[in-house]
Amino acid sequence: MDYTLEATHHKEKLLKTVYALQVKSDTTLQKASPLLSNHHGMGMVTEHQVHQLAEKVKGICHDLDNIKNLLYYRQNNLVQQIPNPNGSSYGGPSGIHCSLDGSIYITSENAPCVHILSCSGQTQQLLPCIEWGRESEAFLPEDVTVTRSGMVAVADMLNRAICVFSHHSRFPKGEWIKIGKVNSPRGIGVDSSGKILVTDYTQGKVHSFALDHAFKILSTHTVSNLCGPRYVSLGPDGGFLVSEECGDVKLFNNQHKLVYSLGSKYGHQFGNPSGVCADIEGNILVADEQHRTVHLFPKSGSPICLVSEGLRKPTGLTCSTSGQLLVADTGDNCIKVFKYRVRPAYSSDAPWVSCDSPNLTPRQRTGSMPL
């Protein structure tokens, strides 16, 4: 059978099936509603039958969510490879962040710098990671993020420090300012309230804190009892996500309370989860370094494998506002960009903004908002 004809038949069958469900449920509702409203009791319907129907409907709704998700998303749709701007001088890229205007921030293994790239992957700026002073010393950033005020922030594991880059400095090119000490900072992010999030790998903690305009730490909070926390990111509904070394991925709410782990909620078995992020529709995306995959965990439905091949050692992970998935492939020394949606990622409750949108303010273009 011709592939096009076969696909057309499958489409017709799917639409007819969904339509039949809609018609039958509408008809039943129209007939049952007045009977239940105007008569006492349930007629001959038993409690067991109601329970059975509820369970079947729950399963059907789950299946419909899966069908919808499988129509919306695409697998292994690689659209671009961005070479490591450091070349082969250092290790592969490991930390990655994408701002509102589409600018890409990258750290690489053993590289004393942060690269800032355009949407298309062209280098816009290089921030050398050097502490200026009597004895200028370089440091090696593990991961990178951007604060609400547009400042670049990094985790420096070797020096057990968190640093932000300030352009307002006595040095003409700006300077890195140490804002705090953490035993073993690994991943860094920003939560929905603008606080900086830092994973403390050996201590099994995530620290969150705010900064005032004098770079003083305020409103500190710590989440404990984690097992080798690696990457941290803003999560859906104002919470945050944390990946654990060779373990699970956990979602915390904005009160720093555990909501669930992805393993327990979705029944998913990770190998070694690394980069985590959430897209603008509230889906959670996770890179698995051991399995060399990227999975999407939707709000409703089963997990979907977005990338099942072509990754050697996926580490950092981020989503752009234009609906693309960016994966730092340390093993292949590049950033791999995937188009994982059939259409642009926008809806009535999740407005989509292109990095080329003229409606972006100058502050939005730099990812900048007040602290």
Where does each model-flagged region fall?
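Conserved beta-strand positions in repeat-built beta-propeller and related beta-rich domains
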Residues: 106-110, 146-147, 154-158, 196-203, ...
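Blade-level signature of beta-propeller repeat domains, shared across WD40, Kelch, NHL, RCC1
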Residues: 314-371
